[in-house]
Amino acid sequence: HMLQLLALVAMEPPARLDPAAVRDEKVKVLRSLRPITARDVESHSVRGQYGAGAIAGQPVPAYLDELGRASDTETFVALKAHVDNWRWKGVPFYLRTGKRLPERLSEIIVQFRSVPHSMFGDAAMKPNKLIISLQPDENIGLQLMAKLPGL
């Protein structure tokens, strides 16, 4: 699912709007993914299992307690991926998924590079972002660099 979304965001426009052409462009992206070597695993990924906690004030058990046996299966994974092609060279893609997170959310955030200088003096400006929300509400939003009114 996450790789499908990454491929859709990173693919080139297909020559035709038919399933085969879209699939071919997505495959090009997936083939361009930089492999994560054993040496890079620690610096490019995080994995874990949820522990005991509470949901809506009710206690919930840890993953291993629910399972009733030892397991190395992840319930959370985050990784930094790179698409090694001319368009995405040097641009990291961050993918995160997990069970029992604080909110059920699926979104794609494209964070644009910061401008090299600010026309508003030394004010720290947040980067522009394109936010594509898939779950729980479908939405497309744009957060733009802006300053508070006044000098």
Predicted regions and their residues:
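Secretory/organelle targeting and membrane-embedding segments
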Residues: H1-L151
